[in-house]
Structures are given as structure tokens and as C-alpha cells.
Amino acid sequence: MLWPRLAAAEWAALAWELLGASVLLIAVRWLVRRLGPRPGGLGRSGTPVPPPSAAAAPASGEMTMDALLARLKLLNPDDLREEIVKAGLKCGPITSTTRFIFEKKLAQALLEQGGRLSSFYHHEAGVTALSQDPQRILKPAEGNPTDQAGFSEDRDFGYSVGLNPPEEEAVTSKTCSVPPSDTDTYRAGATASKEPPLYYGVCPVYEDVPARNERIYVYENKKEALQAVKMIKGSRFKAFSTREDAEKFARGICDYFPSPSKTSLPLSPVKTAPLFSNDRLKDGLCLSESETVNKERANSYKNPRTQDLTAKLRKAVEKGEEDTFSDLIWSNPRYLIGSGDNPTIVQEGCRYNVMHVAAKENQASICQLTLDVLENPDFMRLMYPDDDEAMLQKRIRYVVDLYLNTPDKMGYDTPLHFACKFGNADVVNVLSSHHLIVKNSRNKYDKTPEDVICERSKNKSVELKERIREYLKGHYYVPLLRAEETSSPVIGELWSPDQTAEASHVSRYGGSPRDPVLTLRAFAGPLSPAKAEDFRKLWKTPPREKAGFLHHVKKSDPERGFERVGRELAHELGYPWVEYWEFLGCFVDLSSQEGLQRLEEYLTQQEIGKKAQQETGEREASCRDKATTSGSNSISVRAFLDEDDMSLEEIKNRQNAARNNSPPTVGAFGHTRCSAFPLEQEADLIEAAEPGGPHSSRNGLCHPLNHSRTLAGKRPKAPRGEEAHLPPVSDLTVEFDKLNLQNIGRSVSKTPDESTKTKDQILTSRINAVERDLLEPSPADQLGNGHRRTESEMSARIAKMSLSPSSPRHEDQLEVTREPARRLFLFGEEPSKLDQDVLAALECADVDPHQFPAVHRWKSAVLCYSPSDRQSWPSPAVKGRFKSQLPDLSGPHSYSPGRNSVAGSNPAKPGLGSPGRYSPVHGSQLRRMARLAELAAL
């Protein structure tokens, strides 16, 4: 009996011990759960283990690498490559776009292998201390820990795959205020509940609007959302804290979030503390409605099909079809810019873009066109119409950098590697001249572009290889700077696009504000550094055998002397050369094909404008003649009043009044033209010759010969009976007029032939003015034969003077009138120093008359003058300044509109030598001399 009792007592004691141990264990576990895991706890391996929440929240994980990434950014590409190799990672070409990927991979590897590098121990400890549980998000504000509370946000899933676009603003933790009255209630709910769930909206690429309502892709699991993105081509997803926002994104309503430069708010919706409203707990967003509306509008361009990229775009690049290529990319910018602002892949497998193919196929024009289009803001606005200028420039710089420096997938070769490898010097010139190019990038075999020159083309010449090496060394230019004043020009220091931090020369020569402002007028290049320095020295101090001539050119031509010297040296050495021409408005070498084409277009436009101007002037002149000539017996008032000073109605009134006061003594008119004087001179001569004669005409009109006899070229005989002879004052007046015209012609033209031609043209123009007044028939055709005999005698007398040996024949005058010899120069019908400068620039150019007909005609017109005459031509500025002091011998429109036209002058207004602008002062002087001659004859 004793043994069973002892056994029962032992079992009871053992049971109580087990019960006590269980209670103690439960208490310990409760305490541990109550306190929660400490952030400084170590795992089994002895390394710091981040809490599960840190792994679940991408924002916290990225924040732990900030300091490490900042240290890696300080390393140069070679040191970074060594660290990547030491960490056991594969290293490819490190460029400005791929560097971030390698830095991120290296940072993750270093965090996992923290024991290898002692320099990262401190950082790991700090990173571990910074990680916090999402449930411990309450932060004190102004000493009160219960006033405000914040939740950590979920980082937006951006461009984490592939190459990153321009860095958007950092997504920071957003704290939303909670009313103090709800603090206790919120604390109770926060401790009992977990972090609010996330909703992932997947937005496919919809091809039409009705398809947006068919199905909505919203997931609560991130893996499911990623799987949906992989299955739906071209789709994207984003995390939201509410299902409504995720559904809006999936439908495409809230497509993008604001650009970094437009708002300071984060790109993705921010999870905030639950707020009480209408007795229900709702998830609020710290994003105002006004800023939510300000979204980036998605463009309507579709992703091109793979067949279009290969069959259309790539074929156009390979064949060098610039028009087809330009039409494709401007019709749809996604031919060049893919998702994530990455270059569009035109050849799968190797992942070639347009620049790879163009560099491989030696299509330098396609390379240049691609860069020009990508750097055009209008093209980028097709993709992002709502971006401001700053963000647009960031995108442009990013995309251009990707096109220039992105390696392919096989050998990590950049477009510059391809151009050098195949010996395409023109492509190397285009690529290496861009300021964003990386010339020392290494491929898979650790070779730079300079190391692979002509690897795939062994038969290339040594000169070509040397030229490619010079292109890779850098592009330098030798500039010529001029001031707006008459100070001497300055040959500037060497300049290169690579010089970003420091400028070799500034816009001012010197440091004083009183120094003149200098502008770029010409430059030689691109050249290698050695050639550019040699050319600069040669330009400043020419060789001894040419020093005298070049010094004379500089001193004798202060406007373009230095340009002429630099041009001759550059052409002699075969260096590229351009200079600025004001009338073209661009930098160009006129001796090149491009320069000749621009000059041809300019001269063609000048000729077209001149013809249109002449037609307009002829129409205006005919309208004025019809308005001022109402009949054959009308008195012309142009000798006493300009047409511009009186209206058409006033002219008609005065003509009618004169017709009523004068007897009709004029007979019928023919259609031939024979008068040698302007209308006003003839009126004065007739009044002075026959002041009281019964057959004198007060209107001053002379009458032509008989039509048939004039055409036969015979001189008409005066009819029998009354013969009215003009006094000798007529011959005196003719001689006086010729002397006056001869003096005017000599003052303008130095050669006697030109003076004679000018005089004949003026006489012919005056005859034509009278002819226009005599064309219309008048009511005086019905007068008697006596008046007709008087008219015939007067016409015969005037015809005799006009057809005398001292004057040109009538047929020659008509021929000159019908086909005047017009010579069009750069600034009108008169040459200037600019014509001489352009002729000097075309000295070594071969102008094809079939390809450049306008340039050939202009050059022939300039070469008609002797070198001494060309040296005396005024410059455009001086010519425009003194134009008002020179007589206008060529009549209206002697100058083409432009910089030579006098301000405020009417281009259709006749000049001093025109019949329509004969001054009353000259008429009165001529009248007095005619009367004195008449008295002397008596």
C-alpha cells in the first residue's frame, strides 16, 4: 500500500511542476510577443537580418542603400569595374546610362557580403538601425507624440527593368495629420490591425476606346500583377492604396502621374493613416484634386509592329533613304522612342537600334538626321505634350545619350565601335563631334573604339585610319571674332564641344565693360588639336613668301580681310571653312556645293522679286497715265505738281478746267512715237517759241508722223502751203538737254560707253512717257486740214531733231525700250562691295551654268567690270547712306527692296531722271533760256 501511495504523490508533484513550467513558458512567450523583435537582432548566421517589413516595402530597402550608392557614385569607371569583379559579378560596358544598374547590383552584393569589406561595416549598422517596423510609424511632433502619425509609402514600381529614364523626384514618406480627438481611437485600431492592403492596377495598351470597359485588371498580389504584365504586351502596372484608384488606372483614366518638374508630390499614390468619415474607416490620399487633374496626357501613338520596324524602318536606314526615314519617324515617334524612353530595337537578338544599323552600314546622313530629330523639341512634344521645357530637355538629353552610347547585346559594342570597326570615317566624324558621346567606352573584350579601328576592314588605307584617329582625338575649331565697331578682329583660342566647365573664349574681348562686344564671324574646323593649333599660328603669322600679300589684303579690306586670308589658307590646306554672310543669314562656305546652292536660291528669289516689282510698277504707271490723260488737248500738271501730292479727282478737275479755257487746236494722232522731249519741256518750248501764234498749242503736245511713213523709215515732207517752222531755240534746247544728261551720266559712271548708254536710255524713257500720253484718240480728230498741216509740220520738225545724226535712230530706241539690258546684283541693279567679296569667295569654285544658272549670270555681270572699278564699289552700308544724294537715272525701282532702300521713300515714286518727276524749277530755267535764245535769234 505504501508504494502506490508514494507513486501517486510523485506523479502529482510532477504534474504541478509541468503545469508551472507551462505557465512560465506561456508568460515568457507573451512577454516576447508583447515587446516584439528588436531591430538589432542577429540571425543564425550572425549577420544582421532586416525585418520582414523591410523586405516587403521597396521604399525602405532602397533607403538602406542610399549611402552606399552615394559612395559608389564617387568612383571612376575603372575603379567601379574592379569592385564589380571583386564582388564576383559580371561587368559590361559602364556608361552614363548603364552605370546606375551596375552600382545597384554592386550595392546589393556588398550588403549581402558585408564581412568582405570593412569600409561598409559602419554603413550596414546604420542601415539596419534605420529600418523600422511599419506598425511603429507614429512620430512625435513638437513634443507631443500623439498629435501626428505617418505611414511609410510603397515605392512606385517604375523603370526597374532595363535602362532607367531621367530620375524623377525622390518618393518620400508622406505624413497626414490626424485630428486630436480621433487619436485614441486610431491608436487602438492601429495596434490591432495590420498595414492596409495594396491594389495593383494593370493598364493594357488599348487600341480603341470601347475596349476600355471590357475587363479591368486589378490584383491584390504583386506577383499576379507581374504575371499579367508579362502576358499582356505593352502593359504597365502601378500600386494603389484604394481599389477605386487602381480601377481608374486599369481603365486608362489616370494614366500617368505628374512630371517631377510640375509638382513636388510623389509619383505614386501615398498610403496614409485611415481617417474617420461618416462613422466609417476610409483610406485617404494626400493628393489634392487639382493636382490629380494635372496629369501627363498619354499620346495616341501605337507601338509599331515588328514587321514595320524591320521591313520599313531598318531597310530605310540601311539604304540611306532619308525621306522615307523622316516620314516614318515623324508620323509615329514610337519608331524611335520605345517604352521607358528607351531606343526602339530594330533588330532582335543583338538588340540593335537605329544608330547601330546606320553606323554599321556607313550612313552618316541617317546618323545626323536621327540626332537632329531627337534634339528637336517639337518631336519630343509629340510623345510628351504636357511636359514643360525643363523636363523636355532632360528627356531629350537622356534619349540622345542612349542612342549614342548604348551597347549591343552580343559584344557590348556602341555605335562608335561599329563605325570604327568597319572604317566608316564619316560616321565617326558625326558621332565623335557630339558632346554626349563617350569615346573611351569598352566592349566585351575590353577594347575602346580606337583599339578596333578597321578590324573588320583590313584593306582600308593608312590615311583613312589616321583620319579616324584624328576624329577620335577631338574636334577643335579656330574662331574669328569681330566687333560691331571698326576695331580689329580677334583670332580666338581653340574651342571644342567637350569644353563644358571652362570656356576658352568669351563674348567680350578682355575683362573691362568698355571693351567691344565680339561676335563669331568665321571659323575653321573641325580639326585635330595639333592641326587646329598649327592653323591658328599660320593664320596669325602667315608664311614669309605670302606675308606681304596677305598683309596687304588685311589692311586694304578691313571688313573681310581676315576672312579672305583664313579662307585661302583653309582651302590650300584642305581644312573645313565657313564664314557668316549677312544676306544669306547663315555660316557657309560659298565655294562648296552647299554654298553655291544657297547663293543660287538667293539670286533666284531676287530675280523673281525684281520681275514682280517691275510688273507692279508698270501697272501703277499705266493706271496713272490713264488717270492723268483725259484727252489729247489736256494740260499735264506733272510739271507743276507731283502725282503723290494730289488725288485723281483733283487731276481730272484741273484738266477739265484747262480744256475749257484753251481752244482745241490739236488734230488727229497716230500710233508712232517720235518726241525727243518730256511733256513739260515741250510745253515750255512751244510757249517760248510761238507766244502769240494762231497755231500754238497751250497744252504743249507735239504730234507724231504719219504712221505708214514712220514705219517705212522715211522722213516725211511738209505739205505745200502754210509751213510753220520752229525757231532755232528748239535746237538749242535739245543741245542743252543733252549736255545736262551727259553731265549727270558722267557723275555716276566713269566710262564713256556707260555714259552714252545711260543718256540714250533716259532719252528713250522720256520719249516713251510722251508716247503714252499720245496713244489715246481725242475729239480733236475732226478738226480741219489747216490744223492738221500745222501738226504735221511740228511733228516733222521734232522727228528731224530726234532722228538727227547726233541722236540715236528711232528703231534703236524702240529696240532698247523693248529689251532693256538688266543686270541684277546682290543688292539690286547696282553693284556693291558685297559682290566683290562674294566673287572673291567663289574664286576657286567651278560654277556650272546648267546647275547654277543664276550664279553664272551674276558672275558674268560682275566680271564685265574691270578690277579697278570693282575695287571702287561702295560697301552696302555706305551705299545705302549716300543713295539719296545720287540721281535716280534708271527711273522707278532702281533698287531692290531691302537694306539699300531709303527709309520712308516710296519705291514707286519716280526719280529725278524720270519724265514723271520733272521739277518745276528745271522747267522755269529752261523756259527763260529758250526766250533768251529767241530774242538773240531775232
From Swiss-Prot:
Result after altering residue 27 to G: In MCPH16; uncertain significance
Keyword Endoplasmic reticulum: yes
Gene Ontology molecular function, alphabetical: protein kinase inhibitor activity; protein phosphatase 2A binding; protein phosphatase regulator activity
Residues covered by the LEM domain: 69-113
Keyword Ribosomal protein attributed: no
Effect on the protein of changing residue 585 to V: In MCPH16; uncertain significance
GO BP annotation list: cell division; central nervous system development; mitotic nuclear membrane reassembly; negative regulation of apoptotic process; negative regulation of phosphorylation; regulation of catalytic activity
Domain of life: Eukaryota
Cited InterPro entries: ANKLE2_3rd, Ankyrin_rpt, Ankyrin_rpt-contain_sf, LEM/LEM-like_dom_sf, LEM_ANKL2, LEM_dom, RNase_H1_N, RNase_H1_N_sf
Pfam annotation, one family: Cauli_VI
Gene Ontology cellular-component terms listed: endoplasmic reticulum; endoplasmic reticulum membrane; membrane
CDD domains, per database record: LEM_ANKL2
Lumenal face of the membrane: 1-12
Topology in membrane: Single-pass type III membrane protein
Ranges per topology, Cytoplasmic: 33-938
Annotated region (Disordered), positions in chain: 609-636, 870-924
Basic and acidic residues bias locations: 609-627
Family per record: Belongs to the ANKLE2 family.
Subunit structure: Interacts with BAF/BANF1. Interacts with protein phosphatase 2A (PP2A) components PPP2C (PPP2CA or PPP2CB) and PPP2R1A. (Microbial infection) May interact with non-structural protein 4A/NS4A from Zika virus strains Mr-766 or French Polynesia 10087PF/2013; the interaction may inhibit ANKLE2 function and contribute to defects in brain development, such as microcephaly.
Role noted for this protein: Involved in mitotic nuclear envelope reassembly by promoting dephosphorylation of BAF/BANF1 during mitotic exit. Coordinates the control of BAF/BANF1 dephosphorylation by inhibiting VRK1 kinase and promoting dephosphorylation of BAF/BANF1 by protein phosphatase 2A (PP2A), thereby facilitating nuclear envelope assembly. May regulate nuclear localization of VRK1 in non-dividing cells. It is unclear whether it acts as a real PP2A regulatory subunit or whether it is involved in recruitment of the PP2A complex. Involved in brain development.
Protein name as annotated: Ankyrin repeat and LEM domain-containing protein 2
Gene: ANKLE2
